[in-house]
Structure formats: C-alpha cells, structure tokens
Amino acid sequence: MTDLTPREIVSELDRFIIGQKEAKRAVAVALRNRWRRKQLADDLRDEVYPKNILMIGPTGVGKTEISRRLARLAKAPFLKVEATKFTEVGYVGRDVDSIIRDLVDAAIVETRARMREDVKARAAKAAEDRVIEAVAGRDAREQTREMFRGKLKRGELDNTVIEIDVADTSNPMQMLDPTGQGQMGMMNLGEIFGKAFGGRTQRRKMTVAESHDILMNEEADKLLDDEVVKAAALEAVQQNGIVFIDEIDKVCARSDMRGADVSREGVQRDLLPLIEGTTVSTKYGPVKTDHILFIASGAFHIAKPSDLLPELQGRLPIRVELRALTEEDFVRILSETDNALTLQYKALMQTEKVGITFTEDGIAALASIAAEVNRSVENIGARRLYTVMERVFEELSFHAPDRSGEEVTVDAAYVEKNLGELARSSDLSRYVL
C-alpha cells in the first residue's frame, strides 16, 4: 500500500494527465485516507469507512486514465470494471458479486508475486541447481557441476536446449466450471477435481534462457505457503481494495424512459449492498466489502447523475466534475506528458531509422484540427488526437521502411499537406476523422 502524500499523488498523475485538478485531488485524498486509517487504533479503524467517489465528465477527458494511473500508484488490490458488463441477478450474464471475486483473484496474483520476491535468492539457487542437473546429469561430480555453474552465470549456456520436468498447469476438469458459477463459494467442481489431477509434471524441451522464469516461479512457489498467500491477499482486499466502476451512467434508467430496461435498475440495486458493505463468497473464503473504496465514473451526456437510484447516489458522497478539454490542453497533452503521442510516434519511426522532429507550430496545428473536429462533429476529447495523428502519419508509416535514414519535420505545413483538406470538409471529417 502506498504512503505517498496527496501532493505527491497529484504530482505523479500530472505527468500523464493534463488538467482535472479537482478529480486528481479527490482520488489523492481518498488514497491517502487508506493510509491514515491504517494508523488508527483497531476499534476506531473499523468505524472509519471510505468515502466513495463519483466522477462526472464527458468522454475522453481523463476519467479512465486517472483510474489506470491510480492502479499503479496504489500498490493495493485494484480492479477496473465496466458497469455495462453486468446484469441483474437472475438474468443471463455476470452478476456484480463477480467484481469482488475478480478483485480477490488479482490480489492473489499480486500477493504471490510480492512474496516470490522475498524468497527470490533461495529460489534462484534451487533453479540454478535444476538447470545444472539437466545439463551435466544427475551423477556429475562436484567439479563438473561448478564448471557448468560458471558457464551458466556467464551466459554461455543460454542457447543450450535442455529437457526438464515442469508442473502441468492445465486443469482437465476446467469444463465443469460454467462462467462465474465455479466461484460461488460453495462447490467449485473444477477446483475439487483439479486437485485430484494436481501434482502432475510434464517433460518439456526448452533453452536454458527460456527455463529461467519457469523454474524460478516453480521453486519460489515451493517455498511459499498457499494458506499464507491466501490470508494476506484476502486481508489486502478487505482493508485496501479499490474498485473503479466505469460507464456507470449506462446503467441509469432515464427519467423519461421508465420501465424500458429492467436489467439497468437491477444492476444498480445489486451494487447497493456491495458498496454499502456486505459479505461476498469467493473460492478463497468470504470477503467483507465494508472498507473497499469504490470510484464510479460516467459521461452522463444522456442520463443525469440524478437518474441514478437515490440510495446509490447516497453511497457515492464525493462528486467531482471533469471539464471538457480545450485546444490549449491538447497542445500540452502532445508536448508535456510523459506518454505523449509525439514521443510514441518518434520512437515507433526510430525503429525504421526514420528521425521525426515536431515543431511548435506543428503541434499547435495538430491540436487545432483535433479541437475543430471535436466542435463540428462530436466531442470525444483527447481520443480525437489518436485519429488525427494516425491520419498525419498514415503515408509515412506505410513508406517508412523505404525511407530509412531520413529526417522528417512535422510542422504546420506538413500537417496541412496530410490533413488540411479533410479537416476543412465537414462531410469528410465526419466519416474519416
């Protein structure tokens, strides 16, 4: 779990997301409150519940990107889901309880990976011994083994093909688990029968380099106690878990269309106990959702936040509004962020030995066209930049292998040449941009 201060969290988000200060501050405070709660005495800690957040803003302004970056910062079990994937209990489809099951699955993987790091040195030694045994033979003398150990450390054996016994991870009884049904916490048939077939190994041929990760993971898992991993993961989910529910507006029944879709309000009703605090059965044991932080987001361009069930609105007390992006924001997105599209295209073209230079007026022209098309066609926010950039680089991307060694300057004239006509014709831009 992260111990970053709110200022540090916002600063980290600023590297990838332009603007949206209010939303960044809200998630930063929510994340810091997880840490603050951990410092409290046990009796008071149980009484402090997370303040769930509702992010409202048009498409392409950074709602999903905030969640993606938050997941990396949180160092806590994190899951992002789309509300549209779920149906009311009783209908065909996934029910909302599977959110918690997926969160637990993610936590198990994350916890196991973290614990593997703790036993990495011992696992590396055991994996090394297995490789040497495969290369030199089981009955090799100590002197021979040490010679091969030296070669292994110098990388001289990386391309040597060896035959080793590795765990067979396939579960022949997987077909007994209908989607979502095998995790109901009652009788997981695939799990029961899978254990009967467990412990099997299969002999595989691979190079020494390929065997490294497989053997490291196997040896690390032998040193780990599954029950300890499970207990740590469940504790992390219950105390620090974060669930980001995207497209929450798509399960709103609009006020002028009451009764049009039974499943929509049903999904909201099913979310109520989950967000308020309930116990969900998973194949690893029961999970209490009382202290899981829920962040919901939606564009709300058709439905309104008030179209959500009043009870659900009450369970999302903190509301932040994200503003639409302007042309100036687009310029900053293309030039200031750590993952800017300009940097990505430079790196992609560099693989073909084609140098790319973006001038200030070139970036301004790209931003101007994206903003203009958003105004005249449909405002899809920063996602419009993907389309504009792809059209500008379409010709160059196709011919790049034949232009190796060239230097290309993307200025206003270059953008106009590749995109000007399309941007000026509203009929063309409606379909192409």
From Swiss-Prot:
Gene3D superfamilies: 1.10.8.60, P-loop containing nucleotide triphosphate hydrolases. GO terms for molecular function: ATP binding; ATP hydrolysis activity; peptidase activity; proteasome-activating activity. ATPase subunit of a proteasome-like degradation complex; this subunit has chaperone activity. The binding of ATP and its subsequent hydrolysis by HslU are essential for unfolding of protein substrates subsequently hydrolyzed by HslV. HslU recognizes the N-terminal part of its protein substrates and unfolds these before they are guided to HslV for hydrolysis. One of its GO terms (biological process) is proteolysis involved in protein catabolic process. This is ATP-dependent protease ATPase subunit HslU. ATP binds at residues 18, 60-65, 246, 311, 383. It comes from the Bacteria. It is found in: Cytoplasm. Belongs to the ClpX chaperone family. HslU subfamily. Its main location: cytoplasm. A double ring-shaped homohexamer of HslV is capped on each side by a ring-shaped HslU homohexamer. The assembly of the HslU/HslV complex is dependent on binding of ATP.
